[in-house]
């Protein structure tokens, strides 16, 4: 870390256990310059400290620092600042393409006559391999062993590549597969709350901050660590020393009071919070939690709430440091000095939260009485669509009506070679999965207790349910076994299948053949119930159309019940050994029972499991790789290919030119997610990506997933807009990645149409509705759009990360003016679009767009340029953020 010039003289010293640390004091800044800044939200105090520490008169000036102090007056700001996170967190689906980009940049800089070593992370980078394990085997004692072996075999090339990166790049560590989910590893081990490092022989203390290449990076906000998800390309730039450009955000205060009622889980709470904040509208804003309710909210529950910030649309969901933070650091085995430093530093900086503190100033606020939270799920296709437990059958029936299957509601269908029948609404996947819940001891112990009580009453999982348990941390296995609960989960088929994301990201694996055949043959609308954070269309499993987010104990309950057509609040879940009805309340544990099991979790468990976190098992250690400074690209690889983004890169960018007579590649409605744009799950054999892999000699059984193929642009560009549930208004009545090729009127895959347009050197645009790009921080949603030849995306609104990613790939994001939509303009996709831009373009400018219809009619409109900052404009002018960085390093 290189500190700034401290022209405001705020540098102070703090001594902890005899060790003296320098730090940039907010109290000094308040006393000397900015009265009242102690009333800033805690999250903005972290940003203010960052600016004080990195003030260099260039990227950070006293004007920037003053702008945060001035925020108190207007509670909003249009001022751009340069934020420098302490570190970067990655997972392998987004991490592999990021390392591919870094490797390609090394190749490019060597070709330009530079030194490969110039491309290396300047700040600590941790990549956790968690996205690749699939649920191939389940409900078996050897499921973990089998799935791990298959994972290593499938991903050998990718893992060899990451091993090369580990050797080639400084400041780059890889947490091997089979360790846990990146956000749990971050929460339980990597996160420090307060960081320290040396600069010119002096020791400095400062807040732990980060950006991550996964949208759920926000989970660490529960530990008082400011961080959020960014696209891989933005993370790469941050690694290479480029600050994160951002506007000082609005901060929404979320006041919590009271306490959760008996039987209510952290999952019920987070689904309620998500619904409230989506309704409020917090895209691009910070959310900060405060109020007396924090006193009774364990840190694991806070982390669950912070985790789902992407689902409620916020940049982050921040909890300030308090006594609960210290308790958690102690529980997870952090060393005593680090814990003492966290408390001393937070108190010295006015960053310590106490119920008696004066409330911070917020842009706006809302309030939730924790006692009002009810048992709930969310679905069937959006995480913000909360459903009370008692209303689930009604909501599923509404979904049946929506998809035209309501008349078959009571019909049963035979399953070949089985003695049971299936119906619409049957639960075919019940998964305890995802970073949101699987390292929260209270809900996992609750799931174990439900399993115990169910077994004692003679209940069993329904035979059509594929069940799985994939914890976010090995510590979970320790405490479930120590409590004697894992054996009951095993008896219900919730055997350990792996340590990773699994079902939540679409790695649910195949359904059993007989179940899959029945669902396909009769076009059944079946359900999954998962303890995940996302249930977008086509994400969990291609055959499962209704997906419900729920707490781990409810996941177990629905595996027993087997259908989403039953009201578990009043209908029996099954029958006991004597044939008596058993209800959910009969097997639901009390808060006291759960607390007794949670009390058994100890710091010893955490210290044991994280003692050799970077070592990996024998499979990982056996992987061999090259050790050169530049990567030896293999042209025959179907996993890792040299990307085209830096080919023929000139030292100076071309001037901006108008986009003329562009065709519309696709016309979309609202809530198009990054899963729609760039799916992560299975690859259909008949899709452009599947046909490409077949042409390279890859058997269908070895296709793996789109997520695992993100190191190969040839697969990913073919997979762009290939989600099986995406709907293009240019091809009404059809689902999947198809469009109308306007010059001939033919219907074809979006990829094939894009290639035809490219052959004829014709520009392309995408037009869509509200919330375009919601969901994962998936940079391939922008990279793929770029490779298809799309020059601009025009929508009613953008989700934060995807808008940034589009700019990072040289694509112009434009927003319709309020009241103007594709519908008011009566667009059908046959129009030609011209966009007037030049080097005079400015952030937030109004950009003229000309619409030329097929009948010759011409309409002119103005759109808002969603390039929001001067830095973003530079990235766009350079054709992308990495091109900008490479030119800067090479000059």
Curated annotation (Swiss-Prot):
Record family assignment: Belongs to the aconitase/IPM isomerase family.
Keyword entries, A-Z: 4Fe-4S, Iron, Iron-sulfur, Lyase, Metal-binding, RNA-binding, Tricarboxylic acid cycle
Annotated protein name in UniProt: Aconitate hydratase A
One GO BP: propionate metabolic process, methylcitrate cycle
NCBIfam families according to UniProt: aconitase_1, PRK09277.1, PRK12881.1
Cofactor: [4Fe-4S] cluster
Cofactor: how and how many bound: Binds 1 [4Fe-4S] cluster per subunit.
InterPro entries associated with the record: AcnA_IRP_Swivel, Acnase/IPM_dHydase_lsu_aba_1/3, Acoase/IPM_deHydtase_lsu_aba, Aconitase/3IPM_dehydase_swvl, Aconitase/IRP2, Aconitase_4Fe-4S_BS, Aconitase_4Fe-4S_dom, AconitaseA/IPMdHydase_ssu_swvl
PANTHER family: ACONITASE/IRON-RESPONSIVE ELEMENT FAMILY MEMBER
Signal peptide extent: none
Binding-site residues, [4Fe-4S] cluster: 435, 501, 504
Pathway: Carbohydrate metabolism; tricarboxylic acid cycle; isocitrate from oxaloacetate: step 2/2; Organic acid metabolism; propanoate degradation
Superkingdom of origin: Bacteria
EC number of the protein: 4.2.1.3, 4.2.1.99
Enzyme class: lyase
Subunit comment: Monomer.
Catalysed transformations (reactions): citrate = D-threo-isocitrate; (2S,3R)-3-hydroxybutane-1,2,3-tricarboxylate = 2-methyl-cis-aconitate + H2O
Gene3D superfamilies listed in its UniProt record: 6.10.190.10, Aconitase, domain 3, Aconitase, domain 4
Pfam families: Aconitase, Aconitase_C
Species assigned in the record: Legionella pneumophila subsp. pneumophila (strain Philadelphia 1 / ATCC 33152 / DSM 7513)
MF (Gene Ontology): 2-methylisocitrate dehydratase activity; 4 iron, 4 sulfur cluster binding; aconitate hydratase activity; metal ion binding; mRNA 3'-UTR binding; mRNA binding
Physiological role: Involved in the catabolism of short chain fatty acids (SCFA) via the tricarboxylic acid (TCA)(acetyl degradation route) and probably the 2-methylcitrate cycle I (propionate degradation route). Catalyzes the reversible isomerization of citrate to isocitrate via cis-aconitate. The apo form of AcnA functions as a RNA-binding regulatory protein. Could catalyze the hydration of 2-methyl-cis-aconitate to yield (2R,3S)-2-methylisocitrate.
